Amino acid sequence: MQGDPDVLRLLNEQLTSELTAINQYFLHSKMQDNWGFTELAAHTRAESFDEMRHAEEITDRILLLDGLPNYQRIGSLRIGQTLREQFEADLAIEYDVLNRLKPGIVMCREKQDTTSAVLLEKIVADEEEHIDYLETQLELMDKLGEELYSAQCVSRPPT
């Protein structure tokens, strides 16, 4: 089934974003684990896997539309050197996604590609949940201070 070139372009742009996010979140999770924030690292790693599922769904859609998924392109990673910087970097990538997808969903509907629009709406819903989580972490960091917030993220050995 031949897909619209504009829809395929949008899907490949989003694929690039997902591939970038996978790597950024995965590296952040490994850094967090190395710093001793194992529970936080597990959450960040799960976010990386969520982005991988998005990439898989987008890849499947591109292939169904007789397009070629571009796995050779990846955006610049924004790697934070502190928890705050990591949250801010991850938040920035999520807002980039929303700014691309919201008008993209409208375009898909205008091109009569409801299935792609629904897929992208699902991704937007997932990203909005992640934005809420990241904003909450930054708010907690502001209220508690970075040291107390960080202390809450350290895993305690079992007793």
UniProtKB/Swiss-Prot annotation:
Fe cation 2 binds at E51, E94, E127, H130. Its cofactor is heme b. Iron-storage protein, whose ferroxidase center binds Fe(2+), oxidizes it using dioxygen to Fe(3+), and participates in the subsequent Fe(3+) oxide mineral core formation within the central cavity of the BFR protein shell. Binds 1 heme b (iron(II)-protoporphyrin IX) group per dimer. The lineage of its organism: Bacteria, Bacillati, Actinomycetota, Actinomycetes, Mycobacteriales. Residues 1-145 form the Ferritin-like diiron domain. Homooligomer of 24 subunits, arranged as 12 dimers, that are packed together to form an approximately spherical molecule with a central cavity, in which large amounts of iron can be deposited. Signal peptide: none annotated. GO terms for cellular component: cytosol; extracellular region; plasma membrane. Fe cation 1 binds at E18, E51, H54, E127. CDD domains: Bacterioferritin. It is an enzyme of class 1 (oxidoreductase). Belongs to the ferritin-like superfamily. Bacterioferritin family. It is found in: Cytoplasm. The gene is bfr. This is Bacterioferritin BfrA. Disruption phenotype: A single deletion is slightly more sensitive to oxidative stress (cumene hydroperoxide and plumbagin). A double bfrA-bfrB mutant grows 40% less well in the presence of an iron chelator, is more sensitive to oxidative stress, has significantly reduced pathological effects in guinea pigs and a marked reduction in its survival in human macrophages. Pfam families: Ferritin. One of its GO terms (biological process) is iron ion transport. Its EC number is 1.16.3.1. Heme b binds at M52. It catalyses: 4 Fe(2+) + O2 + 4 H(+) = 4 Fe(3+) + 2 H2O; Fe(2+)(in) = Fe(2+)(out). Keywords: Cytoplasm, Heme, Iron, Iron storage, Metal-binding, Oxidoreductase, Virulence.
